[in-house]
Amino acid sequence: MAKAPVCARKRVRKQVSDGVAHIHASFNNTIVTITDRQGNALGWATAGGSGFRGSRKSTPFAAQVAAERCADAVKEYGIKNLEVMVKGPGPGRESTIRALNAAGFRITNITDVTPIPHNGCRPPKKRRV
């Protein structure tokens, strides 16, 4: 007796019109995550995962490439409007926002959510090179 063929169900992509782009720009890398309004991740990309290694990873161009890759990953969800949350002091802050704008998203607002301590932990000592 032959088994009936099992049909693999096609994964249905939900359509999202508004999204939130979380940009984490550290001194060493830039991480771009695009979520829906509830915070469910739709796609992400990093400068390191985009092929940049070492000191090239911490450049504005690497952050731009990461933003373009993240934008390509979430195009199939139908996102048109993006709210941008930027965290961190890194070099990829502005170039990431420009790349998302150039990718065809309408940026509704930009918020800086960098955590600022109320004199919390002691910072690391200064480097002596």
Swiss-Prot record:
Domain of life: Bacteria
PROSITE patterns: RIBOSOMAL_S11 (PS00054)
GO CC aspect terms: ribonucleoprotein complex; ribosome
A single BP term in Gene Ontology: translation
Ligase among keywords: no
SUPFAM superfamilies: Translational machinery components (SSF53137)
Gene Ontology MF term list: rRNA binding; structural constituent of ribosome
Cross-referenced InterPro entries: Ribosomal_uS11 (IPR001971), Ribosomal_uS11_bac-type (IPR019981), Ribosomal_uS11_CS (IPR018102), Ribosomal_uS11_sf (IPR036967)
Gene3D superfamilies in UniProt: Ribosomal protein S11 (3.30.420.80)
UniProt KW keywords: Ribonucleoprotein, Ribosomal protein, RNA-binding, rRNA-binding
Disulfide links within the chain: none
PANTHER family referenced in this protein's UniProt entry, alphabetically: 40S RIBOSOMAL PROTEIN S14/30S RIBOSOMAL PROTEIN S11
Quaternary organization: Part of the 30S ribosomal subunit. Interacts with proteins S7 and S18. Binds to IF-3.
Described function: Located on the platform of the 30S subunit, it bridges several disparate RNA helices of the 16S rRNA. Forms part of the Shine-Dalgarno cleft in the 70S ribosome.
Family membership noted in the UniProt record: Belongs to the universal ribosomal protein uS11 family.
HAMAP family recorded: Ribosomal_uS11
Name of the protein described by the UniProt record: Small ribosomal subunit protein uS11
Organism (species): Salmonella typhi
Phylogenetic lineage: Bacteria, Pseudomonadati, Pseudomonadota, Gammaproteobacteria, Enterobacterales
